[in-house]
């Protein structure tokens, strides 16, 4: 019996059975970062959500049949402004932020995509698509700008499910006097005076650079063709970015439907408020790394809520994720765990539109099972289910010893343990107790063994 994966499609606003156009060639595109500043925790949520989706699709169809493209936007007005502010070159900024993004994704346990194209390497494809749009009268040139004619696009509002007036209400519109319609968006913009040369490119319309939306249309076309299966991104990209991608791609290639399934993850807030630098609650993934919060803790936090629902970052949520992982790691401690087939109920939770809260509950139930098991065989089966399920969603990639002692200076602690053992030999109980209490203040628990040795663990 074929596995049925139900996935919510923003385009149809329903959960649909995922049926790729070619099961031997499943194609997935996700909007990657604009590399002007260090990625924030919201970017991390997107990275983890689509990493999980990638893992599920691989499980169903096989690793060699799935192509996952995630782009790098390295040409943008924000990049120019940020480089100027920092007094660095465009390349210095984008290279540094791209490397930071890769470190952040590794920290969160995300697999590498199949292909990670950079926008600046694909301006030829962008120009070719823009020329097609002009030829088909879906785009026009004004003062060296090329604009897309929104009113020429059939079903422009389909993805957002709002009227044109609602979509543009309160939206700042640039160069509205030179456009046919105020809603028309830029496909190509001319270079500004004194701008960095490596941010502009030769084109039939003069030196300039692409608009944001055409970049993703071009890179998805280059690597996945006119039609592909999944397009993912944050809910904030539904309009204008994804709406404009659909419009320009379908108009450039009239026989194309572009992406079949549109998947969007929900917003992330911080302590109940929208994340904003002006509010002082802007949290980067680097901030979490510098606090020595383990990546698995952040990943579990990001998976703790259904991907389409809002998620609030706060200290308690991180603390709860840490306690949960401690519980799971404690459950498999000193048990000979083995990889087994993914339990049916766990897999079914993920096949139901990636229901990660239910998946996490199921792992918790297996952990409880370990502690109430009456036989060693039952304990081993529950522990093996924990590690198999957790590994599948990118968690529990350490041994319990590595987990509980992460960030601890083992040489420092072992030195005190040995001093305490020596004190006990000399019956200096006062010193032995002082050492135990000192380590306890540092959240290190000592456990004396029947054979006279002492083991330690983090609280």
From Swiss-Prot:
<feature type="binding site">
    <location>
        <position position="241"/>
    </location>
    <ligand>
        <name>Zn(2+)</name>
    </ligand>
</feature>
<keyword id="KW-0862">Zinc</keyword>
<dbReference type="GO" id="GO:0005524">
    <property type="term" value="F:ATP binding"/>
</dbReference>
<keyword id="KW-0547">Nucleotide-binding</keyword>
<dbReference type="InterPro" id="IPR009080">
    <property type="entry name" value="tRNAsynth_Ia_anticodon-bd"/>
</dbReference>
<feature type="binding site">
    <location>
        <position position="216"/>
    </location>
    <ligand>
        <name>Zn(2+)</name>
    </ligand>
</feature>
<dbReference type="GO" id="GO:0005829">
    <property type="term" value="C:cytosol"/>
</dbReference>
<dbReference type="InterPro" id="IPR032678">
    <property type="entry name" value="tRNA-synt_1_cat_dom"/>
</dbReference>
<dbReference type="InterPro" id="IPR015273">
    <property type="entry name" value="Cys-tRNA-synt_Ia_DALR"/>
</dbReference>
<dbReference type="InterPro" id="IPR015803">
    <property type="entry name" value="Cys-tRNA-ligase"/>
</dbReference>
<keyword id="KW-0963">Cytoplasm</keyword>
<feature type="short sequence motif" description="'HIGH' region">
    <location>
        <begin position="33"/>
        <end position="43"/>
    </location>
</feature>
<dbReference type="GO" id="GO:0008270">
    <property type="term" value="F:zinc ion binding"/>
</dbReference>
<protein>
    <recommendedName>
        <fullName>Cysteine--tRNA ligase</fullName>
        <ecNumber>6.1.1.16</ecNumber>
    </recommendedName>
</protein>
<feature type="binding site">
    <location>
        <position position="277"/>
    </location>
    <ligand>
        <name>ATP</name>
    </ligand>
</feature>
<comment type="similarity">
    <text>Belongs to the class-I aminoacyl-tRNA synthetase family.</text>
</comment>
<feature type="short sequence motif" description="'KMSKS' region">
    <location>
        <begin position="274"/>
        <end position="278"/>
    </location>
</feature>
<keyword id="KW-0479">Metal-binding</keyword>
<dbReference type="InterPro" id="IPR024909">
    <property type="entry name" value="Cys-tRNA/MSH_ligase"/>
</dbReference>
<comment type="subunit">
    <text>Monomer.</text>
</comment>
<keyword id="KW-0648">Protein biosynthesis</keyword>
<dbReference type="InterPro" id="IPR014729">
    <property type="entry name" value="Rossmann-like_a/b/a_fold"/>
</dbReference>
<keyword id="KW-0436">Ligase</keyword>
<feature type="binding site">
    <location>
        <position position="31"/>
    </location>
    <ligand>
        <name>Zn(2+)</name>
    </ligand>
</feature>
<dbReference type="GO" id="GO:0004817">
    <property type="term" value="F:cysteine-tRNA ligase activity"/>
</dbReference>
<feature type="binding site">
    <location>
        <position position="245"/>
    </location>
    <ligand>
        <name>Zn(2+)</name>
    </ligand>
</feature>
<dbReference type="Pfam" id="PF01406">
    <property type="entry name" value="tRNA-synt_1e"/>
</dbReference>
<keyword id="KW-0067">ATP-binding</keyword>
<dbReference type="GO" id="GO:0006423">
    <property type="term" value="P:cysteinyl-tRNA aminoacylation"/>
</dbReference>
<keyword id="KW-0030">Aminoacyl-tRNA synthetase</keyword>
